[in-house]
């Protein structure tokens, strides 16, 4: 970001003094209104909720409220900057929830990197919320935190860095395959990056029918038996790279139909793209500098190029997913956001790009396409009902 843009961002945040605020819904302008909204009238809904805790969704705002939870350990590209320093991002996330899907959200920035403490904190607060969005928590802690919270909370828990990224990337993949005449079951996908996002994208792709997946970390292709794998990567090796391809990213990407980058600038070269299948699909999502620039990928033979940036076509932007996903989950009071719901969200996003308009520069809707959140919410709510996690 240019220095003048950085200063402008600072100036605006100083002017705003926060991007969200609490606004009252009940009129309190007379003694009578005060008596209804607070004492003594407030006792009646309290007693109802005491009789049936689920009535907290009826008599309070809980059913539209999401906790945006971070420990500040993996904030954007800034790293472990701490919970307070992560607050501007969490406020921004809350603002996006409200703007795109009318979901109320509140930041919870926790002063701990301990899994037990984070899980216990969120578990104890879960009764105040209708859902939990985990944000900017480093891998591999985020996997354990998400898994355990799903076990102990009766409200949906969603890690956007994993699951939101996976949904949007898979939506783009659906249309890129349609554009290039490919079937998901027939493609070879190679990943650069074995963190939370990469593994989650690969997992959703596998669920959607992709069979040939290779994930590369800094040491090259991951496969069963490779030295230096942590427990998360050991598990990943059981369902990826069944042919045990070894070697660097350059070796793994040969003949691949799709490259997915969630790693570092410059990780993919034009020479690597030239070794891929004809009309390859390149998703270079490192920010702010992608693994390869779109024009370079296209010049090397790619048919479709997408990035995480708004100044290029085909932006892989999580705002296409998380507002609508939570809107749909909250609308049916879902107890979980499961794989069925995420797959439904991906197909809903992809479906907004029809055959007539689909092109190399348009395989995913834009961030401000007002059709997206309602379409995603409807698909997610339907999938929640069909998979048995809806409570309405």
Can you describe what each PLM-predicted range is?
Residues 234-303, 309-311:
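Rossmann-like adenosine-cofactor binding region
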Residues 107, 133-136, 157-160, 191, ...:
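General beta-strand structural signal in soluble alpha/beta enzymes
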């Amino acid at each position: 970001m240019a220095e003048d843009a950085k200063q402008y961002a600072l100036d605006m945040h100083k002017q705003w003094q926060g991007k969200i605020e609490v606004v009252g819904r009940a009129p309190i302008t007379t003694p009578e209104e005060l008596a209804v909204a607070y004492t003594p009238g407030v006792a009646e809904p309290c007693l109802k909720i005491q009789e049936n805790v689920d009535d907290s969704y009826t008599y309070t705002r809980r059913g539209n409220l999401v906790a945006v939870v971070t420990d500040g350990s993996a904030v954007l590209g800034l790293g472990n900057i701490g919970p307070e320093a992560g607050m501007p991002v969490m406020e921004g996330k809350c603002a996006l929830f409200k703007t795109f899907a009318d979901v109320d959200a509140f930041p919870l920035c926790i002063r701990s990197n301990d899994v037990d403490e984070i899980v216990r904190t969120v578990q104890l607060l879960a009764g105040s919320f209708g859902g939990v969005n985990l944000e900017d928590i480093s891998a591999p802690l985020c996997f354990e935190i998400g898994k355990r919270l799903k076990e102990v909370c009766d409200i949906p828990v969603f890690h956007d860095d994993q699951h939101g990224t996976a949904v949007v990337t898979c939506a783009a993949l659906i249309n890129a395959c349609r554009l290039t005449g490919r079937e998901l079951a027939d493609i070879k996908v190679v990943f650069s990056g074995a963190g939370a996002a990469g593994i989650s994208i690969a997992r959703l792709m596998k669920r959607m029918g992709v069979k040939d997946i290779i994930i590369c970390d800094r040491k090259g292709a991951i496969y069963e038996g490779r030295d230096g794998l942590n427990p998360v990567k050991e598990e990943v090796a059981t369902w990826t790279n069944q042919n045990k391809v070894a070697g660097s990213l350059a070796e793994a990407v040969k003949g691949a139909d799709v490259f997915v980058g969630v790693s570092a600038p410059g990780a993919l070269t034009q020479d690597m793209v030239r070794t891929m299948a004809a009309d390859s699909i390149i998703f270079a999502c490192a920010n702010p500098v992608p693994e390869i620039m779109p024009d370079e990928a296209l010049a090397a033979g790619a048919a479709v190029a997408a990035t995480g940036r708004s100044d290029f076509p085909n932006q892989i932007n999580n705002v296409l997913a998380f507002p609508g996903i939570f809107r749909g989950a909250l609308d049916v009071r879902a107890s979980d956001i499961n794989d069925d719901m995420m797959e439904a969200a991906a197909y809903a996003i992809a479906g907004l790009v029809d055959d007539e308009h689909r092109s190399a520069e348009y395989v995913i809707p834009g961030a401000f396409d007002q059709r997206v959140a309602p379409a995603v919410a409807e698909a997610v709510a339907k999938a929640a009902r069909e998979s048995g996690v809806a409570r309405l």
